[in-house]
UniProtKB/Swiss-Prot annotation:
GO CC terms: chromatin; nucleus
Compartment(s): Nucleus
Domain of life of the organism encoding this protein: Eukaryota
Primary location class: nucleus
One Pfam assignment: BTD
Name of the protein: Transcription factor cbf12
Length: 963
């Protein structure tokens, strides 16, 4: 059966002479290799291959094979990366001692002639794999057209289809036929066509089979139409690994654009850049793994490889590979620059690669990059040191040699004279190695050819060994709001605050990060955060954003004077303009609505849904709704305290702690550097909180746990369920503990605030405390009241106020205290949402979309060893992993909290608060844990979620630990 007949390129596309020269070289090489494969049984040839160990190129003369005599110039400009060992020799032999017709690996460096300067160069050996997993060592031809290669899985097993330059014959012509064809060409026949062969021809047959030439057919199976316009990058399948072959200027590590476009086809694909041929005494190893980003040469080579969008989609539909379940890294909605734009920005992109020189393993790989198949590369103090890392295939097949340069100098990341220079700036001597390895901009990373698809297990292995990939949202918001009428604007108070933790957020500081929120009834009117505040490692505020971009640029071009204290490590934003005008719906806890929050940039879009927000229409309804909603304040709740003065004008002052910025910086840095980081247990200790106290702020607030001292004194003798349902009342002694920093207040007495007066005579608990109540906090020891000292930069202090007496003649019997506005506080219950995801390399060069971010509120293990996960935002196909072990999800159900919930829940906070403080629309996942996870020797494993092609960290670990 003959291959697909296609029209051969015209003279307008390809110069005839170069086309014939390239075709002649292809067929000569294919014929020679076919002869070698067929005659491996020859003792003479076998001994020759064993003696040379394939360390020298092999020149073929007719039916004989001899080592090539390479000139010194050829040795200095090219190399061979052989793959041949005793193991492969034994694998290539049958049981009777004879050789296979097609061994797994045969790589030969073949001399080719340079058409411009007549110098002799060598092609780098490589292999290609067809759909039947047969290894073929013939090289592709390359022309000056901007086309790329795609295997045709729908044709014959040995047939390939190609979208342009990389064209391979479906069968190998004989040497005599090639000589006949050369004679025809030399005679000057204008009607000479490329000989093709309609019959199937196996390379293992070598010269023994002579198919009849068919001059009327074009011998290349090519189902897609050639198009020159560069639209989207080509996407080679994992079975083909093109070589790194560019003719480069020896005076520079970066090839010029002229050297790429003006080089002949043979030079373009046959010559390599600065590799050395190993000596015979050197122990042969599999080709070493280069940096995950590849070489600058590869970038220059493949930025010309483009195909049209229709052809790309059609080709992808014909490829049946394990990567089909992964989304393609390039979406039609993502704009791509033209070739001229990429050519123009190349010099800047290459300059921005310098920040990777400390650890090339930190360079972001892509969807099918082999970075997932190896352990993280260790840091090296020698710039030109090679990294001993070997790739493995997903399907358990043979290892394909990687022919990319393996040293930092060959990759163009170091200047040639940097061998004797100190590779670390003085300011980074005591810092973690990845401090200078964070990319400044995702769009500055050049595209590379993807090598292999990845599995979830390999992605988990990568993210758990590269903790810098972890990023997080931490959102704090009130549990209810007041309805606005007409033109009235009752803004949400306290406003929604969003913390951006993890340094990967800061790779796109200049990409105009947008944070917005809207209610479910008003989706078309989102409210945006006006400013995003950034903080450095010491918790100091960095502003404005132009300074952020400047410090990011300094990090990528660091020197002795670089100020790393100006580099941000986390950010936060306040959404102060959110108000609600609807009616809400009754969900059993009162009337409520739902919020949606989104975070988007040029490369990301994340969405948080179903954030419940209680609604009250009038303050007079607050007391009536106490028994049927979450209006009341209970023992263990998270609350926010703010001063009521000008609270409805977005100028409220919020109670916080003096070291909150420094504590959040520590958490964000731990997410980057500490692989054992678990936010449920990673809380500041007493030493870190030494000297910290309560403070006020208007651009940041933090939730506080509120505890009854009487309930805490009961200790283990009380029922935790009863304690969590304990409603707080006035005149009770409480303490406040910051949820973020752990700073604790002194014992305080709750006092109801009425008409600027506070009663001093009542001592017994009386009226229950509910949200938006007016309160005063009296120190239990000094009997003074908590207030804001405006003279001391809004610091927290204590005052006695003006005392009122029932008997003016007896000053010891004061009944009331008249307090200033700075001592009047409002309290409201709050809720927090934490979702952590891994910013993987697979998302670096694609538009990363997560329509629903999951977050886990609490978990528990029942008496039947079934694992329960409670939270929101779960997809129907969510997967639960305990490190590398997958748990089977038995059911996904809506959960309605009640008082019968067992007390053995593990909350996302250090204190197990009541269920009523959680969101009302919880989802319950019931999972079955594998038996192996109950063994006493099981290692500490993070509990991960996988949905929307994204890995999420739940914040919990297995085995479960109550805290």
């Amino acid at each position: 059966m003959s291959p697909n007949v296609q029209k051969r390129p015209s003279s307008e596309d390809i110069k005839t002479q170069e086309f014939y020269d390239s075709t002649r070289n292809i067929r000569r090489v294919a014929t020679a290799i076919g002869s070698i494969n067929a005659n491996l049984e020859s003792p003479q040839l076998y001994s020759l291959a064993k003696s040379t160990s394939l360390q020298e190129p092999v020149r073929i003369y007719g039916d004989s094979v001899s080592p090539a005599i390479s000139s010194s110039k050829a040795h200095s400009t090219s190399s061979v990366s052989p793959y041949y060992s005793e193991k492969n020799e034994s694998q290539a032999l049958n049981a009777d001692g004879t050789a296979f017709a097609n061994p797994s690996f045969h790589s030969f460096g073949l001399p080719q002639e340079d058409s411009q300067d007549n110098t002799q160069t060598y092609s780098t050996p490589y292999t290609t794999m067809n759909p039947s997993n047969e290894m073929h060592p013939y090289p592709p031809a390359t022309f000056e057209n901007n086309y790329s290669v795609l295997p045709d899985h729908s044709s014959q097993p040995n047939a390939y289809s190609f979208t342009g330059s990389n064209i391979l014959p479906t069968q190998s012509p004989s040497l005599n036929q090639m000589q006949d064809y050369q004679n025809l060409q030399q005679n000057g026949s204008s009607n000479t066509t490329i000989p093709s062969f309609s019959s199937q021809h196996d390379l293992s047959q070598g010269l023994t089979h002579q198919p009849v030439p068919n001059h009327d057919e074009y011998a290349f199976s090519y189902p897609y139409e050639l198009q020159r316009k560069p639209l989207i990058p080509a996407h080679p399948v994992p079975s083909f690994r093109p070589t790194s072959a560019l003719k480069v200027n020896m005076n520079s590590n970066v090839p010029s654009s002229d050297s790429v476009r003006n080089s002949s086809p043979n030079q373009y694909y046959a010559s390599t850049s600065k590799q050395s041929i190993p000596s015979q005494s050197q122990n042969l190893q599999p080709p070493q793994k280069a940096s995950v980003l590849g070489t600058v040469n590869n970038y220059r080579q493949y930025q010309n490889s483009f195909i049209s969008l229709n052809d790309y989609q059609a080709a992808q539909s014909n490829i049946s590979s394990p990567s089909s379940r992964f989304p393609t890294p390039y979406s039609p909605s993502v704009p791509f620059g033209t070739y001229q734009e990429k050519e123009k920005s190349y010099s800047q992109d290459h300059a921005e690669l310098s920040y990777y020189q400390q650890s090339p393993s930190m360079m972001p790989p892509y969807d099918r990059s082999s970075v997932y198949f190896q352990q993280p590369l260790s840091r090296t103090d020698v710039p030109n040191q090679s990294f001993q890392q070997y790739p493995t295939t997903v399907d358990g097949g043979s290892m394909i040699p990687n022919l990319y340069p393996t040293s930092a100098e060959q990759m163009g990341l170091y200047p040639q004279d940097s061998q004797n220079k100190d590779t670390y700036p003085k300011s980074l001597v005591n810092r973690p190695s990845s401090a200078v390895c964070e990319p400044a901009r995702n769009d500055s990373i050049p595209m590379m050819v993807y090598s292999q698809p990845v599995t979830i297990e390999q992605r988990i292995q990568y993210v758990l060994s590269n903790c810098h990939c972890l990023s997080a949202f931490y959102l704090c918001m009130p549990s209810l709001c007041q309805k606005s009428y007409g033109t009235e604007r009752r803004y949400l108070c306290p406003p929604i605050v969003l913390y951006l933790l993890g340094t990967t957020w800061l790779n796109n500081v200049t990409d105009n990060l947008k944070i917005s929120a809207q209610t479910l009834e008003d989706k078309d009117n989102p409210k945006f955060a006006k400013n995003i505040f950034y903080y450095n490692a010491d918790g100091a505020l960095i502003s404005p954003e132009t300074d952020i971009a400047k410090s990011t640029y300094q990090l990528t071009n660091y020197n002795e004077n670089t100020n790393f204290d100006s580099f941000p490590v986390w950010g936060n934003a306040l959404l102060k303009t959110i108000y609600y005008t609807g009616q809400g719906k009754n969900d059993g806890f009162g009337r409520s609505t739902f919020l949606q929050l989104s975070v988007q940039s040029k490369t990301k879009y994340f969405k948080l849904e179903n954030l419940r927000l209680g609604v009250i229409s009038k303050p007079s309804q607050k007391r009536a709704l106490m028994k049927v909603s979450d209006m009341s304040i209970r023992h263990g709740d998270c609350v926010c305290l703010f001063n009521r003065y000008r609270a409805q004008h977005n100028n409220a002052l919020f109670l916080g702690t003096s070291n909150v910025q420094r504590a959040i910086s520590k958490v964000s840095l731990n997410m980057k550097y500490n692989s054992n980081y678990f936010p449920t247990t990673d809380a500041p200790n007493d030493a870190e909180n030494e000297g910290a106290g309560l403070a006020m702020a208007n651009n940041l607030w933090e939730p506080f746990y509120i505890f009854s001292v009487d309930e805490l004194n009961k200790g283990n003798n009380s029922n935790p369920s009863d304690s969590r349902s304990k409603v707080l009342c006035s005149n009770m002694v409480i303490i406040l503990v910051s949820k973020i920093t752990g700073v604790q207040s002194p014992p305080l007495i709750l006092k109801k605030h009425d008409n600027w007066k506070v009663s001093l005579s009542s001592r017994a608990p009386s009226e229950a405390i509910n949200c938006l109540s007016k309160l005063a906090f009296q120190c239990h020891e000094t009997k003074r009241f908590l207030y804001i000292d405006e003279k001391q930069s809004s610091e927290i202090s204590f005052t006695s106020g003006e005392l009122e007496y029932s008997d003016p003649n007896d000053p010891t019997k004061a009944t009331h205290s008249v307090l200033p506005w700075s001592a009047m506080w409002s309290i409201i219950s709050t809720q927090s949402v934490r979702t952590m995801f891994y910013n993987e390399p697979i998302h670096q060069n694609a538009f990363h979309v997560v329509p629903s971010m999951p977050f886990v509120k609490f978990i528990r293990l029942d008496e039947n060893s079934m694992f329960h996960i409670y939270g929101t935002g779960f997809a129907n196909d969510v997967q639960i992993w305990m490190a590398y072990t997958r748990c089977e999800v038995k059911s996904i159900n809506a959960f309605k909290p009640d008082t019968t919930l067992p007390p053995d829940i593990i909350s996302d906070s250090r204190f197990s608060s009541r269920v009523y403080a959680c969101t009302a629309n919880l989802i319950e996942l019931i999972c079955e844990i594998p038996v192996c996870m109950f063994e006493p020797t099981v290692e500490l494993s993070p509990i991960l979620l996988f949905q929307y092609e994204t890995l999420f960290h739940s914040g919990y670990k297995w085995p479960l630990e109550s805290h």
